[in-house]
Amino acid sequence: MTKTNILSDNCVLKRKKIIDKMRDRIKSPCKKILLVQPVQITEDGIDIKIALNKRYYMYPPYSLGVLTTNLKKRGYDVSILDLNFDLFKIFFENSTESFLNDRITDIWKKRLEEKIKNFEPDLIGLSCTFTMGHDLLIRTADFSKSINPKIPIIAGGVHVTNAPEMVLKEGKNIDFISLYEGDISFCDFADIVNNKKSEETLSQIGTRIDKQYIRIDKRTAPASEELNTIPDYDNLSIGEYNNFGEIGTFRYWRNKDAIGSPVLSNKGCRARCTFCSVANFNGSGVRGRSVKSVVDEIQHLKEDYNVDHITWLDDDLFYNTKRTLSLFEEISNRKLDITWDASNGIIGSAAVMHEELIHAASESGCIGMYFGIESGNDQILRKIKKPSAVKHFLKLGKLMDKYPNIFTRGFLIMGFPNETLGQIYDTIKLSHEMNLDWYTVQLLTPLPSTAIYNEMVEAGTIEGGSLNIDGEGFTMFSVRESERQRRKERQQKTNAKEFHNMFKNNLDRVPTKSELTELWLLVDYLINYQRIIETNDRVKLKKLQRFLTDVSDRMTIGNPISNLFLGIVETKLGRNIEADRRKLLAKEYISESKYWQTRFDSLNLMELL
């Protein structure tokens, strides 16, 4: 790893070096700026059948929309290119699988080349939010330079901020990186190039000079009125995104024909969880937009794009109780007739301490909430600095039972450093006591620039600089854990090993990484599926029916467990013909897979068929 130079050391000299490089690489006047969202999943990671089932996430580039608004206010000619949307739209227009698999790379490259040649930008900005997008960020920069080597390229986003040196080291064609929130600093960067702003205002910028990484760490984060920015999506078809993928995680529970779009009401999070990169990117604390600005944006989406479902991007939606209540009340008062979900997660303790927030949320159209739980063991929760304890989660479960219209889900993580089997089992027990509608169980993926990542590097349990881009990450764009299990199944169909119940052995033992991978299916089964056998509440059963139908028919086609337990749910609801059909499907899928035969035997599920 190269030595990092931060501005505080001989700041004048370092600023001068960066400014000199800016003057050399970016010609003035610089007026036309192309903002690009690269494809989010590598070609070999895209399954066309999954894509056509709208399984991959398809969020509009919200941050680029905000940046476009701010740049246009300063007089710049801005255009947005969303290569991810354009690629997936072509999937649906040309759904011949063999044709598409051979042409994925050609499709996005052709679209990018056309845009660069037609728009003729003076500067290209690339966005990368998630670690798994690292490779495509680099390749997008490389291809852009091959079209016109004279166009300077600047990259920004959460991943770029978390792994800046690696982005610049591997991205030879990336001239500069924009660190942290670029809403203001990127605009200042362009103004400095055009001699419209003092060089001393340069902030949040990094580059490589003489093989050394140099950055200006001083932040120019948007505050007060600067936060009240409604995204300008240029010519993007915001109302169509929902047609080609997921926005949020509650498609099965919202209106069938709902058109979704994301909205951000505040930035940052009060929590300091050791596995989370929010504080590194947004800084400490939470900064909220005005209620009027947020609801104006929702109304704009409704009127201009026919959006009637909102997914909040907030990492701490319930921060500032008074403001949050006002937000929900204003949504209700304007009679916008929308629904919304909180897919990014709600802090459990914030919900139970202010029950009025849940009531107001329900009244304003909330249909789904995720809660960040992570672990059912207080020792682990303290170690990872969660702002909630087991007692809060138990109260939360009882609270949410009062709002059956809201589909409740919980985030759970396995594999924290030195986490024992007993502590993982505590998470299983807590999930049963809380009795949320469903839980997402994931293996820990330490993100660069987080406290837990640094801890694990120092302990030698992971290698420093590893980006872990195999799709297992805790990100909106990653393939879900259930799909990771499908990949594992394909790899092990012929030699699936015996599946052991590790919780019958020494619970004080820390499982190995390979054991954790194998353990995931068992934990997911014990947390989500096993309790269905004892569930008789018709409201819960109706929720499970909707969810498991979506899992079985769209999310993970060929999954015998989801079909079996959907059959059990259908039996309890008195739909015996459908129940028999689902169980027959489960038998069919099991017969085709040694992997599933072994696991059904180990879980004693064959007797349920």
Each model region followed by its residue ranges:
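Radical SAM [4Fe-4S] cluster-binding motif and immediate context
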Residues: 59, 225, 233-414, 421, ...
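N-terminal [4Fe-4S]-dependent radical SAM core
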Residues: 2-33, 39-51, 94, 208-262
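Proline-aspartate-enriched helix->loop->beta-strand connector
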Residues: 120-124, 307, 436
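Glycine-rich beta-alpha loop elements in corrinoid/cobalamin-binding modules
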Residues: 63, 70, 79-87, 97-224, ...
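Short catalytic helix/loop segments, enriched in acidic residues and glycine
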Residues: 51-69
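TPR/TPR-like alpha-solenoid helical repeat scaffolds
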Residues: 595-609
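Catalytic cores of alpha/beta
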Residues: 166-170, 357, 418-432
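C-terminal accessory regions of radical SAM enzymes
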Residues: 2, 34, 39-54, 206-219, ...
